[in-house]
Every structure is written in structure tokens, then in C-alpha cells.
């Protein structure tokens, strides 16, 4: 490579040894250069990237430091027409021990004249009353793996029934256990399976609520209604609670569960706590609803089955035979 600086027809050659050679005096005023293979340089014209042209020059040096940088051309990759579509993840399976428990309960109910969907109301009511109410989620998983509950609409109807059973159980077992249960279930709910209905949005503690609650109370207690309420003559807050809240707000609502569904909440939740008097009253009340003695025995045995599953002994509750004379 050479550089030249014309001065009085003197040319200074910069040799390949990186030193300036002695000046040459030339008669030719035009600069000369040492022949050497020319390097290729590209002079990018200062235009937009779309119209920019590139020309081949043989200039030995061209300063392009202040030229704009070419715009970055983003490359987009088209999705393959054979791309695998997104698939719904498989439904989780319940614990095998619980699956066996639920199989036993549903099999026993199938031997009765009771509607087949009543068994899981008993199941959720006994589990929420147990030492481990969060395992209501196992019942939900078991059910949604069954063919009748494979669609979002069927699962929405299912969760309405399970949720109402848990809500009714609040007045039997307290509020904390049902809250733990519904939170555990909600972890497995898919968005399309959720139900946003609000059954008690417009509830009022009014005369209609009082009449509805008292009517349901009298249906179960019949001739024993007055005598039972008289237990609370010296504790009238409890009498008010029974009529306005227990039976008015909670147990007489028929927006989701029917009469028999409600008894499949109340009797199992009470009996699971090994409560003598209330178990007697609600074995009797279930018989008064028209459930035959043999079917009530199956209900009693299923409650004992769930209690035994958790290692709970129900030794204070009466048998169905012991209550029969009071029906």
C-alpha cells in the first residue's frame, strides 16, 4: 500500500516495511502509486436502507465512520402447518385409597332405592366433618374423572351441588372446615368448569325466610316441633337461631339441593361428630321424609364407613332400629 503527499513534485512513498522512503523528484505533477492488488471497498450511499446502493470502488481509503448503520432486518419464522395444537392437560387422579372409599359408597347406594347422585352428597358431608376436610378435593377429582362429568357444563352443575352441600354444612360443623374444603377443591377447577352463580345474593331475614325455615323444621320434627323448641325457652337465642338461620338461611333454601339432598348433608355431618341427640332427631327426620328403614340403614353404614376410614369411632350415636319407635 502507498500513500503520497505532493509537494514540489516530490512524492513520499510509504513502503510495505512501514517506513517512509526518500522523496522522489518527478517531472510528472500527477501522483503515482505503487502497483499492488487492490482491496475491495464498498461505499454505502447515505440513503434509506430501502434505496441504498452499493458500488465497487478501488479507493485505498474511504472513511465510513459517520455513515448511518444499516437497519436491522428482523426475520420472522412462520409456524409450520404441521405444528401440534395445544392440548388440555390430563385431569389429575385421586388418591387410590379415596377412590376405593368412593367406590364402596357408590356401590352401597346403588343397592338402595335412593337416587344414585345422593351418595357424593353424603361423602362430602362426612369428609368435611372429618379431621381432614381438605380431602374433599379427592371427591371432586374422583367425580370429574367419571364420564357423566366430562364436560364443562356438567362440572359446573356438579360444583354447584358440592358447594351448596358445603355451605349447608357450615351450620352443622362450623365455617372453617367448609372453607378449607372449598379452597382445596378450587385448586383443581379449570376456568371453563367454574360456576359463578350466587344463590343467596338477595337473602333477607324477613317473614318469608321465617316461614320457609319453620315449614322445613316442622316437616322433619312434625309432632316434636314444639317440644324441641321448648328446650330453648331459657336460651331464646338458640331458638331464634334454629328458626331464622339454621332452617331459614341454610337448610330450607332449595335453589340447588332438594329435601333429600339436604338430609344427606345434615344427618351425615351430625352423626360424623358422634352426637347422640341430633343424630336421633335426624335419623327420625329422614324416615319422616319417606326414606325406608333399609335405605336409612345403608346411609348409617356409609357414615360409619367414612368415620372408620379416618379412625374415628362413633360410639354414642343410636342405631336406626333404636330410633324407629319414635318415627
Task: Report the location of each language-model feature.
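Alpha-helical oligomerization segments
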Residues: 258-271, 275-327
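N-terminal mitochondrial targeting presequence
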Residues: 1-79
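Short, low-complexity intrinsically disordered segments
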Residues: 16-18, 38, 117, 201, ...
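Detector for Asparagine
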Residues: 27-28, 43, 56, 66-69, ...
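Acidic, glycine/proline-rich low-complexity segments that act as flexible tails and inter-domain linkers
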Residues: 2-3, 7, 75-258, 293, ...
Amino acid at each position: 500500500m502507498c500513500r503520497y503527499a505532493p509537494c514540489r513534485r516530490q512524492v513520499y512513498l510509504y513502503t510495505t516495511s512501514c517506513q517512509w522512503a526518500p522523496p522522489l523528484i518527478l517531472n510528472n505533477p500527477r501522483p503515482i502509486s505503487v502497483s499492488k492488488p487492490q482491496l475491495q471497498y464498498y461505499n454505502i450511499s447515505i440513503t434509506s436502507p430501502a434505496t441504498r446502493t452499493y458500488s465497487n470502488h478501488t479507493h485505498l481509503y474511504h472513511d465510513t465512520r459517520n455513515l448511518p448503520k444499516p437497519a436491522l432486518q428482523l426475520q420472522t419464522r412462520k409456524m409450520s402447518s404441521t405444528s401440534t395444537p395445544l392440548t388440555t392437560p390430563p385431569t389429575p387422579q385421586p388418591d387410590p385409597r379415596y377412590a376405593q372409599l368412593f367406590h364402596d359408597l357408590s356401590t352401597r347406594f346403588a343397592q338402595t332405592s335412593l337416587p344414585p347422585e345422593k351418595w357424593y352428597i353424603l361423602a362430602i358431608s362426612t369428609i368435611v366433618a372429618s379431621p381432614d376436610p381438605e380431602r374433599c378435593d379427592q371427591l371432586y377429582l374422583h367425580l370429574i374423572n367419571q364420564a357423566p362429568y366430562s364436560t364443562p357444563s356438567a362440572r359446573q352443575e356438579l360444583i354447584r351441588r358440592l358447594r351448596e352441600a358445603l355451605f349447608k354444612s357450615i351450620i352443622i360443623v362450623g365455617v372453617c372446615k367448609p372453607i378449607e374444603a372449598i379452597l382445596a377443591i378450587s385448586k383443581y377447577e379449570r376456568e371453563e368448569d367454574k360456576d359463578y352463580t350466587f344463590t343467596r345474593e338477595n337473602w333477607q331475614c324477613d317473614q318469608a325466610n321465617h316461614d320457609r325455615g319453620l315449614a322445613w323444621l316442622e316437616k322433619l320434627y312434625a309432632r316434636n316441633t314444639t317440644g324441641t323448641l321448648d328446650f330453648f325457652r331459657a336460651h331464646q337465642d338458640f331458638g331464634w337461631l334454629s328458626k331464622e338461620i339454621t332452617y331459614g338461611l341454610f337448610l330450607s333454601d332449595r335453589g340447588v339441593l332438594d329435601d333429600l339432598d339436604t338430609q344427606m348433608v345434615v344427618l351425615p355431618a351430625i352423626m360424623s361428630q358422634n352426637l347422640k341427640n341430633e343424630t336421633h332427631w335426624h335419623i327420625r327426620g329422614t324416615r319422616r321424609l319417606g326414606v325406608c328403614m333399609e335405605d336409612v340403614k345403608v346411609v348409617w353404614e356409609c357414615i360409619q364407613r367414612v368415620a372408620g376410614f379416618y379412625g374415628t369411632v362413633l360410639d354414642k350415636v343410636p342405631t336406626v332400629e333404636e330410633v324407629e319407635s319414635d318415627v
